[in-house]
């Protein structure tokens, strides 16, 4: 186990500069100009960068989930989680999961669905970073990956907002999902409950990150080959 974690740490050191390098172009914060850089990028280029950003977020969230599972989740608890009882925080969002339903979504709803997913995860990831501090022997690599995803989700949110303005010529729809208390902080949980809750968060994040990537790639396909986007 120690050797495996060490190997993963070495991979993280190799991957870390790459993550920051490829994600910088989508970071729309530029001094006091807020979204000054993103509007200057063409729609096609911005969509490509948003997709690449989503791919990286999915990859790192998948690695984070696997690392957490190896470090803290025995096999019986993994099976218990897979059997249900731990609902994802985005379950109530009006976003379809089946392939046929996703294919029927308009470009507008694809973009707004991605935005809803991104915004729904910003607060829970802040919580996750705080709770990981309670763990004994939590590897720095896991903490760093979680922090990276948290920061880059905000950057992705900015990119999608500009993309909505460019492609749909409108502002983003206002959602009060997170304001309604969809994510609750439980301060009286036992340690095992903390572990299972955090594991559920990481598992659901991985699924939703993959969904973001899928929606954006479908949108890209429609721009280039509208009738062959299966």
From Swiss-Prot:
Biological processes, Gene Ontology terms: animal organ development; growth hormone receptor signaling pathway; positive regulation of receptor signaling pathway via JAK-STAT; response to nutrient levels
InterPro entries, sorted: 4_helix_cytokine-like_core, Somatotropin/Prolactin, Somatotropin_CS
Matches recorded under Pfam families: Hormone_1
Assigned keywords, A-Z: Disulfide bond, Glycoprotein, Hormone, Secreted, Signal
List of glycosylated residues: 144
Disulfide bonds: 28-38, 88-204, 221-229
Domain of life: Eukaryota
Subcellular compartments: Secreted
Protein name: Somatolactin
Functional note: Selectively regulates proliferation and morphogenesis of neural-crest derived pigment cells.
Similarity field: Belongs to the somatotropin/prolactin family.
Any one Gene Ontology cellular component term annotated for this protein: extracellular space
Entry keyword Disulfide bond: yes
PANTHER family from the UniProt entry: SOMATOLACTIN ALPHA ISOFORM X1-RELATED (PTHR11417:SF3), SOMATOTROPIN,PROLACTIN (PTHR11417)
Major location category of this protein: secreted
Signal peptide: 1-25
Single GO MF descriptor: growth hormone receptor binding
